[in-house]
């Protein structure tokens, strides 16, 4: 099984930013002067001691495999090529930022169902807009956002009120929060159980601490405690906000608030469910994920949904097609670039390295409205931007689910 996983992960399933460009290198293997439009070696991100995502180092070499060119998209994209100094076993490939006229923080969706305060966020209302999602797997091209299509003049958000309350409040409509996640793997046991810190980015390089999360050491499944107090990551801490828990296979993650399951007076609420598509047959490509959120009321408050005490939670509602109070999001389909031999997405300068973790969340009715985007900028630093209807806690938990190992998904 270990050899199978190594061979499968040797293929380039990473997602790069399409708005980046590098000086084209010459391959060390190719010595006839011909330029190559791909990574200089496979991305064996589970087999290198220098790999930024590696927790338990392992040794051995995996055979080099190639991914056939996909004819899915013919959209013009900018070229990305790796640095000649990169290790061929690293998952990440640094790229240089090009000046971008359309930045992520300047986009704002113009659809009434997302920016009109009187409209609730629910699939019943969203689906009435007649939007369609173009999936590259079906042979159709993915539509690209433009300044006219995605709007403009989003306000950059800031912390309002006590941090314990702000992190669970849905983002106001028309406000963009630009955050950074730092992974701390220093210390005796942080190689296995790193601590993740969420900061809200401010002007002039300043940042405001928001949340911290860490996987519990003694748990049958992946279980992350998320708190506003970075010094006490426990359920008993005053800063405890909620938790992220996975199933046995690591394919489904549940986000709960700080309530207790057995407390009938104040039951634990479902705040999100993250579902990763299984990949048992070993198909190559980036991860596919579905995110379920509680619906929004007309005054922009979340509908209370709880799976405690046998009630129908988010996942049960989704399985039974009862979507009246559930919002369903999907990762935006990356486009295969023949020239770089990789999948690309336009992160508008916020993501600078290729990674299988990079993603953007959209609703099928309007793929131009980026609800959340997450991606790598260095070995242990990631950017996380989110909008309405997400809150900081929900977005942070969704990002943490991307860090966790998924044997059946890769």
Swiss-Prot record:
Its main location: cytoplasm. InterPro entries: Tubby-like_C, Tubby_C, Tubby_C_CS. Residues 132-143 have a biased composition (Basic and acidic residues). Keywords: Cytoplasm, Nucleus. Residues 48-109, 121-159 are annotated as: Disordered. It is found in: Cytoplasm; Nucleus. This is Protein king tubby 2. The lineage of its organism: Eukaryota, Metazoa, Ecdysozoa, Arthropoda, Hexapoda. The gene is king-tubby2.
